[in-house]
Amino acid sequence: MQLLIPESRIVFASFFIFGLLNNILYVVILSAAIDLVGSATPKATVLLADIIPSFTIKVMAPFFVGLISYRTRIWMLVGLSSFGMLVISLTSDESINAKIVGICMASLSSGLGEVTFLQLTHFYQREYSISGFSSGTGGAGLLGSFVFMLLTNMLGMKVWVVLLLFAVLPLGFLMAFYVMLPKARGGGGDEPGYEALDSLDERSDPSSNASFSSSQTVSLKGHVVSTIKNILPLIRPYMLPLCLVYVSEYIINQGISPTLLFPLDELPHWLFSSYRDIYVVYGFMYQLGVFVSRSSISFGIRIKRLYLLSVLQFANVVITVYQSVHDKPFSSVWLLLALIFYEGLLGGFSYVNTFMSVSEEVSKSKREFSMGCVGISDTFGILLAGCINWSLEPHLCSLQVNRGRDWCLNGGSA
């Protein structure tokens, strides 16, 4: 098979699957947030459970992840994500604490997976590995939100059944890693020679001397200080603008959008049978925008002014807050859906262009480490947004209730 298909396409497809599977459960969980905790509970509850474990492991990863082989990490991803989805889907609606535990397990898998696969791109041509992974993460958002919307909004399937179906998807990691992925190329794809995948694993294996020589005993304090010094130069050019974009977009997605509601009798019943359905459709339009923009590198589109994207995304926060409070400037859900799509475009552009900039501008010797570290910033942004949304959503909802619109309290029913 590999003799008939160009290796570049196989690399792209492998990393596309990695990105797709790594992010799709995260997207589905957020799409189901209103079903998991109900209308009265801030959706930030699910967002924080879905992001704190991921953020924690991303922060800790630079200090220990190099000691765990890529093969071991793949099996960890499968176990954590599949079991987590089983817990979420099979526990009763009243067992919110148990569902939160399942969400946390899936979140750990997502965080470890992003660090792992971004580091793995270092061993392949970035035009195909980064582009494939980025497109896959965008595809996860689009596929996950669309399938969830299709099965629940349109076909009327029980939410727990839909979540149970998604529990089998992580097995695809094994196929992509062991069957599809070609042998690793040394030095980020810029050198002609290849190294076997076993050799790649040796450099991340605690029993190997490739990562730490027995003659080079480094104290824990020295290792931490050295790691922090390597992280600091990445903050201003890459991590901060990406973080700011994610703060803004997740304030919109989980804090503001549950209050951006319209009369159900003015909406098509085949798509919107309850106020809860509006939230799900917003999620799909956002993910559609993310998918389009995260795939933009494949078409040669590059945006290097990363802070511009941060400013534009914050403007969307201002617009949507105004809409929630005053029901202006949008009088139709369709115009608001277009804005949500644009919001997704900005988020996707920021993600893919940030990692492309790291790949192009950071020295080869530090590139693998840097790719893993910069991934912390988007998760930190989502974490900040979750903390803000904890009070923002209830406040916006109370303002609407005070003027006679209690739709935000009825997300699960018409």
From Swiss-Prot:
<dbReference type="InterPro" id="IPR003492">
    <property type="entry name" value="Battenin_disease_Cln3"/>
</dbReference>
<keyword id="KW-1133">Transmembrane helix</keyword>
<keyword id="KW-0472">Membrane</keyword>
<feature type="transmembrane region" description="Helical">
    <location>
        <begin position="159"/>
        <end position="179"/>
    </location>
</feature>
<dbReference type="GO" id="GO:0015819">
    <property type="term" value="P:lysine transport"/>
</dbReference>
<keyword id="KW-0812">Transmembrane</keyword>
<feature type="transmembrane region" description="Helical">
    <location>
        <begin position="48"/>
        <end position="68"/>
    </location>
</feature>
<feature type="transmembrane region" description="Helical">
    <location>
        <begin position="74"/>
        <end position="94"/>
    </location>
</feature>
<comment type="similarity">
    <text>Belongs to the battenin family.</text>
</comment>
<feature type="transmembrane region" description="Helical">
    <location>
        <begin position="100"/>
        <end position="120"/>
    </location>
</feature>
<feature type="transmembrane region" description="Helical">
    <location>
        <begin position="242"/>
        <end position="262"/>
    </location>
</feature>
<comment type="function">
    <text>Involved in vacuolar transport and vacuole pH homeostasis. Also required for cytokinesis.</text>
</comment>
<protein>
    <recommendedName>
        <fullName>Protein BTN1</fullName>
    </recommendedName>
</protein>
<dbReference type="GO" id="GO:0051453">
    <property type="term" value="P:regulation of intracellular pH"/>
</dbReference>
<feature type="signal peptide">
    <location>
        <begin position="1"/>
        <end position="33"/>
    </location>
</feature>
<feature type="transmembrane region" description="Helical">
    <location>
        <begin position="332"/>
        <end position="352"/>
    </location>
</feature>
<dbReference type="InterPro" id="IPR036259">
    <property type="entry name" value="MFS_trans_sf"/>
</dbReference>
<dbReference type="GO" id="GO:0000324">
    <property type="term" value="C:fungal-type vacuole"/>
</dbReference>
<dbReference type="InterPro" id="IPR018460">
    <property type="entry name" value="Battenin_disease_Cln3_subgr"/>
</dbReference>
<keyword id="KW-0813">Transport</keyword>
<keyword id="KW-0926">Vacuole</keyword>
<feature type="transmembrane region" description="Helical">
    <location>
        <begin position="368"/>
        <end position="388"/>
    </location>
</feature>
<feature type="transmembrane region" description="Helical">
    <location>
        <begin position="281"/>
        <end position="301"/>
    </location>
</feature>
<dbReference type="GO" id="GO:0005774">
    <property type="term" value="C:vacuolar membrane"/>
</dbReference>
<keyword id="KW-0029">Amino-acid transport</keyword>
<dbReference type="Pfam" id="PF02487">
    <property type="entry name" value="CLN3"/>
</dbReference>
<feature type="transmembrane region" description="Helical">
    <location>
        <begin position="306"/>
        <end position="326"/>
    </location>
</feature>
<feature type="region of interest" description="Disordered">
    <location>
        <begin position="195"/>
        <end position="214"/>
    </location>
</feature>
<keyword id="KW-0732">Signal</keyword>
<feature type="transmembrane region" description="Helical">
    <location>
        <begin position="137"/>
        <end position="157"/>
    </location>
</feature>
<dbReference type="GO" id="GO:1903826">
    <property type="term" value="P:L-arginine transmembrane transport"/>
</dbReference>
